[in-house]
From Swiss-Prot:
PROSITE patterns: CHAPERONINS_CPN60. Together with its co-chaperonin GroES, plays an essential role in assisting protein folding. The GroEL-GroES system forms a nano-cage that allows encapsulation of the non-native substrate proteins and provides a physical environment optimized to promote and accelerate protein folding. It is an enzyme of class 5 (isomerase). GO terms for cellular component: cytoplasm. This is Chaperonin GroEL. ATP binds at T29, L30, G31, P32, D86, G87, T88, T89, T90, G413, N476, A477, A478, D492. Pfam families: Cpn60_TCP1. The keyword Nucleotide-binding applies. GO terms for molecular function: ATP binding; ATP-dependent protein folding chaperone; isomerase activity; unfolded protein binding. Forms a cylinder of 14 subunits composed of two heptameric rings stacked back-to-back. Interacts with the co-chaperonin GroES.
Amino acid sequence: MAKELKFSEDARSKMLAGVDKLANTVKTTLGPKGRNVVLEQSYGNPTITNDGVTIAKAIELEDHFENMGAKLVSEVASKTNDIAGDGTTTATVLTQAIVNEGMKNVTAGANPVGIRRGIEKATGAAVDALHKMSHDVKTKDDIAQIASISSASKETGKLIADAMEKVGNDGVITIEESRGVDTSLDVVEGMQFDRGYMSQYMVTDNDKMEANLDNPYILITDKKIANIQDILPLLQSVVEQSRSLLIIADDITGEALPTLVLNKMRGTFNVVAVKAPGFGDRRKAQLQDIAVLTGGTVITDDLGLNLKDTTIDQLGQAQKVNVTKDDTTVVEGAGSKDQIAARVAEIKGQIEDTTSDFDRDKLKERLAKLSGGVAVVRVGAATETELKERKYRIEDALNATRAAVEEGFVAGGGTALINVIGDVAKLEAEGDEKTGINIVLRALEEPVRQIAQNAGVEGSVVVEHLKGEKPGVGYNAADNKYEDMVAAGITDPTKVTRSALQNAASVSALLLTTEAVVAEKPEDNPAPAAPAANPGMGGMM
């Protein structure tokens, strides 16, 4: 297909239009008085959300060049979400501010490479300043406050604080849909290990790119599966019972994996394959832990067991299994409580006996997975639309809380970004590099300005007021007053704020140094739509 090219100012202006269209949609959701956005779905009811990355991913612009600009901003939101789990709207606002200020200067004749150096220098100084002002998460109240701010709900904040208290800061917390209208917290026996699906075609939820199996059988083996015939009798037994299957194996190679994927895509049965966790003796021990938890048997040569002879009775079972590209979570395994307790006691004995600190840490990790359980937040709502919106908020709050536990927290509401302006302004530079620093200085004001505007207040007035306040004092948009943000419990995870700024600066600098854009050329005479099928030919394939 022929390509269409645009250069210099023409290229940048088109991409800027795309940046603005996406950012103007996303930034209306920022802050406690931000609005929602309604997204049309290809099927089912529309989705109502204020989640920045969800909105960004949903936007496709008709103009190819504008769409490329929009997709670059969407990439900023996605990357921030992947790293920190929240802060996607802030990242979008920062990107728009840097790109707009940068484009003005490039159009006026500034060298984009010099501007890029200045942006990178200023961003580094801002991140260093953020780390210096960061507070550590010390109490349950700290966790509740961070989760409350992210979800705009004190009830959600308390729920997540309770969940983390029960399973620990590093514990496994999953979010499920409830059948009722109430949102509740349960702690169930479960385990998570760091292995994801072998093929993305095994996912059941394309939006989140994860596979969810309800009441599955679980095949646990330390063998490689290269020939589908080795497990064909077992697969047939699983299909006969209309159950899904999780396969945990050393590896699946040859024609076995494509065959499993093909049957999954055809709807023959629901199957997900993951590699066994760990290596060597630790792998054997972890597989045995999974077997005990799920009531299954490890199919291994050590026990003289073959895959061809494996029966349904040797498979483990669980209430639910969730598999992402990185992790597998098994919830409510069908194992005997007595056997689980015995396994826990055995691991505790090994912890006492070992002389290796490394081995002790690994044993404690296994013990936590086996005995700590999984906290399950069951989200309830009156309608499906409300349920999705509430679920997005709780997921954001959980991600924000984990980020805060990892790197601490700073004053919220964009206050921390205002507070680092002084450190960035001290940087020495000349020419276009100085211009790049000034661009970042202006962008650091933008989140506060947007939060204020969404609350119906003049943003520039708020920004100028905060510049004259002592560090930590910010604008509480919910109550329309200035106060010490940390003391008021209005905080943001340092990791979220840092990631939003770094990702925004990175993509913006690349966009400013773009000189040519190549896109697919629209067809002048698109092919006519296929005629409707003859009603008399029904049933033919």
